[in-house]
Amino acid sequence: MFSNFFGSSKRNTIASSSSSSKKDKDNGKDESSKLKNSGSSTLPKPITNNESGNNFITSPSVSSPLISPLSSSPSPLLSSSSNSIQSTSHQQQQQHQGVITSLQMKPSCTSLTDDIEKKKQAKYDSSLEQTARKWVCDVLEIQLEDDKTFYELFKNGVLLCRLINKLRGGTIKRINESTISFKQLENIENYLKACKTLGLQSVNLFNSIDLHENKDISLVITNIVVLGKHASKIEGYNGIHLAGERKIIKITTTPVSPLFGGNHNNNNNNNNNNNTSNGDLSPVSITSASGGSSNYNSYSNNPLNKSSNGKKAKWRKSVKIPAVSSLNSDIRTKEAFKFSPELQKAAQDWIEEVTKEKFKLPSFSSSLKDGILLCRVINTIIPNTILYINNGNSSFKKMENIGNYLKGCLVVGLKKTDLFDTPDLFEEKNINFVISNIHVLGNHVNKMYSHLKLPLIKNIGNGGNGGNGGIGGGGGSDGSPLKMYSSIIHSKFGNGSSNTSSGNGGVIIPPEDMKDLKDWINHHLRAHHSLQIGSDMSNDLRNGVTLLTLLEELTLQKVGIFAREPVLPWHFMQNICLLLNFLRENSVHNVSDISPHDLFNGDIHSLCMITRLIRENFDTDHQMKSIPMDTRRQKVIEEIIATEQSYVKSLSTVYNLLIVPLLNSLDTNSPILSNDEISSIFGNWEHLLRSHINLLKEFKLKLNLPFNDLTIDDSNQNQNHNNIFGDSIFDSNITIGDVFLEKCEFLKDNYTNYINNYDNSYQRVKRLKKSNSNFEELVNTFEIFQDTHNGLDLYSYLIMPIQRIVRYILLLKEVIKYTPSTHPDYQMLQNAKENIKRVADHVNESKMAVENKRKILSIQDSIQNLQFNLMDKERTYIREGFLEIEDTFKKDSYFFLFSDLLLFVKYKPSEETGKEFKYKEVFYLDQVVDVSDILSDDEGEACVDGDDDGGEYEGGNGDATSGSADPEDQTLRRSCNSNNNNNSNSNKSNTVYSFEIETCEFSLVLLAESHTEKIEWMEDLRSCLQHQLIKEEDQLSSLSLSDNDDDNDADADVESSLNSISSPLLLLNNNNIINNNNNNNNNNNNNNNNNNNNNNCKNSNININSSIDNNSDNNNNDYDSKINSEENGDSSDEENKTSNRRSVSFKTHKRLESDETISDTESDDYELVCGRSKKSQPPPVPPRKITFSDTIKNIDNQ
């Protein structure tokens, strides 16, 4: 029983042997006879159909486990009809006494793993994967391997990171092209962070393990497709995306019946004709109406309301809505969307006619919010209804007037539903309710108090007085005040009707400064080409996108969430309300005079008014243009003095509240910190403070400003930073550049010492706060005190000196900007700026040197069994990474490159020592002859295919001064470019990225993980070799040139000849150089196609074996030259001259043209012997080349 329920294959119940012996051997008998001949325990095979239509056959209990359940022998029941099976089903159930084995029955429940796999398969979409693959290939310009799964291609995260950098360059600074899991996970995490930076929502992301552990690859595919669609919105990216062509969406809506228009029969007919069923919720297109009203015709002429073929357009259900905005913003947008200026104007005119008083203020709400006019309207209808009207300015009295008016409306006969709340008017919560109430009151008075013969409220539909027509053209017969909330925006959407009034022949005269405003907007939005304003400024600005983007550019902050691609009228009004609300909160000007409705309908005067408002409040450059040059210069000088005062105050705050108590505690029995610990945190803080007090004193004395003789103890006194000069007159001829030149010499040493100690101080504070409770209490007390003043903590004060030098440079640039070139201070300011810039460069270099030492020290501490001290010489850390040694097949080989050596270690973390690496070998770069590229077959084919269109390279014309003119260098660049080409992807999985480091004794072939990494390693190695060679040659040159004063002329000739080939000063053997150059050029021509960069040391431009017999060399060279000239007879002389050979990390691009450069008598004195004098050179030994992999096993065994 339990066996059948759980489907366990280990609990099979076998039927008795008696039942198994009764098996019928006659396959030709029918089903009924077969049932009779079978024993009571023998059952036929019933067929049950599952939901998917598959048949599951349950075998009888007599079946033996030796018999396969998938037997191919036909069953008699399979040929019987389904009706006979159903007729005997009841009988079969009664006769069933056997047990069905678990192998013969479908399990009633599945495992969780199987369910998860089924769900993953159900979610997987192969077409979506192909879309993602194709887009990645198109963007990265590569070809992904079809035989690899999506998981295998993207597991390491490298392609994803490259994809992000293609969409926005430099987003991911470092891509770990490694096989180590945590580095691959780091790539995926960087990709996910970059997706958020680019604007993807969290719902479109995935977890790192979904990709790295293949948990749910469908989420990764979906993410890439969503990113492909989002790519069209990324600024600066104009490449391929998946969003499709951007279409202009044509929208047509059916507005609510016009409130003040006739011709309602047409609208009703439209509704009857189009809404054929109650369930049809699709809106009616007004373009289907025939003989509609003029309002409808004007709306149907709107290009936004028709499709391109003239037929009615439908609602676009998938309209892209903006991101979620705040509830208050949506409420304001809704009220502005329902607002109608025509209704407001009609209400204002009616109140003015009834009270015979004009509105005192241009704003409707501001004129009514005191409640006086409203109370007078009630008293005009029913005299003495409101006995006392408050004329005071206090808020509660104004609100009392509004409350009395609402009570008066009830007395007149209005319902409570026709009223509004007091805050709706006084706080302008909902001005639409107020307008609605006034219209209802006017219609009610015209109907119930007609004997008073009060003025009639205007009918907006026909623009005249419509008797009892009132609201909606029907005298309010529908009885629904909610009709007042319906907006007439739909009937004007896209028409810009506000621009075509009949005030001047139907044409609006644009403001005089409209062109100036247009140019100003285009200047600030020059980076946003899609937002540039064209000829129709009204239509370009009415959606609010351009003005909101302009605000973000000027304020350098996010204005809010708005629709960047508005489509619906709601989007337009949402942007406009956000714009007005931002200006209301951040501007000193009143924006209540600007109506959202006017902006929506493109009123050019309102748009120009709000543009002027933005320019006057947020464009500081425009504000500065109206200020004289001397005044601007004075403001910048005031800022210099003010920031210096503030800086001195901050320095003295730390000194008096922290350093002094710590120093005083040294005299006690239990000091808080030791003297060394205080110095390690604050460094030379006291010297900085004293120097800047003196500098501030000089500034004030120079500017004839009052200055108290400050000391360190009182330098933190409050200073007035708002007006430095006070009532004194600023002298325009005053100079401050000389003060910087005289007093800023202290910056170099003081700030260098402090900045070098900053990282140490930052870490020391964190460590001491954890270990020293007294120090933690002192720092917490200091920070609590600062919270009440400026909110800065100790770390904020410690970083101030680092930022000060840069601040000086920026301030000096501003002073120079507003100082005329004829001013006596101009040149001194220029010199002061350059001096401080040099100080900043020196500080940066010193900082880099300190960081380099710390890096080398950390590397040394991470290597066990290191046999020498990395700090014993002055060396620079360059790079590090995994490199596989050829033929060792080990992935744990790790290399550190320094300026003078290459360190080989094994990645082997040790729990005992806590060190990550184990020392193996060191290679000194002064023993390296060449670093050459080794192209694999795939790389070589790609290079050959790419030669025709490889592009032009600098120096490709054979220029002697161009480093990239070398054929090998061009080959490297072509091979690098071909890595991104579709031609190099057929056998990418088998591509080996290797290069060779060659010495006189052996060659070391290293394998990188990618082509880019290989090129970077080679470039860094060659740069180190060149630096090493130049350093040795400079030392050798100084020694050689000082040996004999009589040979100065000859030395000069050699120097000039060597300078002509753009190489450092070397001691060269003339004959060997010429012969070797000829030999190398020929060899390069002969072996260039094979990319053979591993020539013997005797063939290099630097003659290592200079002591070999010259006669033998000359004979060999002549013979080689003869053979090569025969083989390369078609090569021109110019090609031979421009053929280059890579030597010890730099190129000699131009060989010597003749043997007459150095005379025969001088050739013995000028020989290159690997940077050493010829006398100290050991006897020459023919170079032997062995592969380093032959001896690497011995190193591993050490």
Curated annotation (Swiss-Prot):
InterPro entries: CH_dom (IPR001715), CH_dom_sf (IPR036872), DBL_dom_sf (IPR035899), DH_dom (IPR000219), FYVE_RhoGEF_PH (IPR051092), GDS_CDC24_CS (IPR001331), PH-like_dom_sf (IPR011993), PH_domain (IPR001849). Residues 632-846 form the DH domain. Residues 876-1026 form the PH domain. It is found in: Late endosome. Residues 8-20, 59-97, 263-275, 977-989, 1076-1118 have a biased composition (Low complexity). Residues 126-232, 341-449, 511-619 form the Calponin-homology (CH) domain. One of its GO terms (cellular component) is late endosome. One of its GO terms (biological process) is endocytosis. It comes from the Eukaryota. Pfam families: CH, RhoGEF. Residues 35-58, 1188-1198 have a biased composition (Polar residues). One of its GO terms (molecular function) is guanyl-nucleotide exchange factor activity. Keywords: Endocytosis, Endosome, Guanine-nucleotide releasing factor, Repeat. Involved in the regulation of the late steps of the endocytic pathway. Binds to F-actin. PANTHER family: DH DOMAIN-CONTAINING PROTEIN, FACIOGENITAL DYSPLASIA PROTEIN. This is Rac guanine nucleotide exchange factor B. It comes from Dictyostelium discoideum (Social amoeba). The gene is gxcB.
